[in-house]
Amino acid sequence: MELFELTIHELHDKLKKKEVSSVEATESMLARIEAVEPKVNAFITVTADQALKDAAEADKRIADGDMDKLTGIPVALKDIFLTKGVRTTCASRILENFIPPYDATSVARLKARGAVLVGKLNQDEFAMGSSTESSYFGKTSNPWNLECIPGGSSGGSAAAIAAQQATATLGTDTGGSIRQPASHCGCVGLKPTYGRVSRYGVIAYASSLDQVGPVTRDVTDCAIMLEAVAGYDAKDSTSVDLPVPEYTKALTGQVKGLKIGLPREYFIEGLDPDVQKAMDEAIATYRQMGAEFQEVSLPHTDYAVATYYLVATAEASSNLARYDGARFGHRSHEAQSLLDMYRKSRAEGFGEEVKRRIMLGTYALSSGYYDAYYLKAQKVRTLIMHDFIKAFEQVDVLLTPVAPTPAFRIGEKTSDPLQMYLSDIFTIPVNLAGTCGISVPAGLSRAGLPIGLQLIGKPFGEENILRAAHAFEQNTDWHKRRAAL
């Protein structure tokens, strides 16, 4: 087995026993990136030289007995996290040459534990998309089928795990942007509860929805990564001051007596038959393990996508107002005046989907429409939140599909934004409710594409969904399947 194929916990054991060094593991990963990157395009920036220096430092730490679960582990980050001295583009022309002067909190926490950054990953521009086709740096391909999308917006984060180009990655999830690509690429992806992980230093898309989370090869790795980045941060006023549990201790493999809810609004006509089959098999697996099932209702699910595309675009139009060519980012050389510079820098710097969402959001916030659209959307959001609260009075976790279909072909939905938006129909409600959800590999379609299972927990119920996901993993082998690149 090559070093680049190992999980965090497998590589940690080898590093601890001094069977391998972090430099060797990092060299193996960099060679793997070089070999498969032309096919996948998961990275925007590869930080090879710095990675080898950091790996040498990690080896010193290990020799001195100062070792954490992540010391010497090669990781990669979605290019939405600010990284001191390393270009951060958010996959946009407007930030093509932006080099941040500081690290995001989650990046600083990984570095403090001795993780080795091998690069920054491709995504949809400003995290707006479900397919990683809108990046200024070119589309990313799904390692399971290079003609298919990896999902989005954290497509690079999932594709890099599927292609074994990083041991673990971090992404962000605003409406499904970790869980949907994890499902399409056969990885584990966790969207924590809003406020569980600091957003400081993460380029904002929709501030009341964005959340940082890991994409990994198995649930144990996911728990290790969440332990590392979770916790209160005074620099983010929305981060919650709660102790961080040892998530790995929750992985008991036991779900006997666990009450699992099946939301009737998620098992709808039109669900891809391969997805339905994977869900039926997952339910049967949980029954064999002693879990109990109950049908529940989340009646306002039908309004989730419309609500999301008002709230998220309104927040995006406000957040993206800061990109004007004045202090940082792309500045138009054609401008004749200050106003002209703002206009032309933004026109040249933003891609089509970003412009579409800025216009949608600006319209929703405009005078005379604020009450009709934005305010009404926030009220419906509250109803969606109450649906989850009521459901969790009856059950411990919810089980649903992640996406209505397996990965679709590149270019299939780019001409129809509404079709693209509907691919997040099962993930968006979790963001609107501010709770947590995880995607776990649960099957393959007849075409050989991965299908993910979504487990949704109560707010700050990450231990519950990690335990349930880990138990499923112990009784199936889907997480061990690898894309044949």
Curated annotation (Swiss-Prot):
Record flagged with keyword Protein biosynthesis: yes
Catalytic activity reported: L-glutamyl-tRNA(Gln) + L-glutamine + ATP + H2O = L-glutaminyl-tRNA(Gln) + L-glutamate + ADP + phosphate + H(+)
GO biological process, one term: translation
Keyword set includes RNA-binding: no
GO molecular function, one term: glutaminyl-tRNA synthase (glutamine-hydrolyzing) activity
EC number per UniProt: 6.3.5.7
Superkingdom per UniProt: Bacteria
Family matches, as PROSITE patterns: AMIDASES (PS00571)
One GO CC annotation: glutamyl-tRNA(Gln) amidotransferase complex
Enzyme class: ligase
Active-site residue numbers: 78, 153, 177
InterPro entries reported for this sequence: Amidase, Amidase_CS, Amidase_dom, AS_sf, GatA
Keyword field: ATP-binding, Ligase, Nucleotide-binding, Protein biosynthesis
Pfam families in UniProt: Amidase
UniProt family annotation: Belongs to the amidase family. GatA subfamily.
Record text on subunit structure and interactions: Heterotrimer of A, B and C subunits.
PANTHER family hit by this protein: GLUTAMYL-TRNA(GLN) AMIDOTRANSFERASE SUBUNIT A, TRANSAMIDASE
Matching NCBIfam families: gatA
Function as written in the Swiss-Prot or TrEMBL entry: Allows the formation of correctly charged Gln-tRNA(Gln) through the transamidation of misacylated Glu-tRNA(Gln) in organisms which lack glutaminyl-tRNA synthetase. The reaction takes place in the presence of glutamine and ATP through an activated gamma-phospho-Glu-tRNA(Gln).
Record-given protein name: Glutamyl-tRNA(Gln) amidotransferase subunit A
Source organism: Geotalea daltonii (strain DSM 22248 / JCM 15807 / FRC-32)
Encoding gene (name): gatA
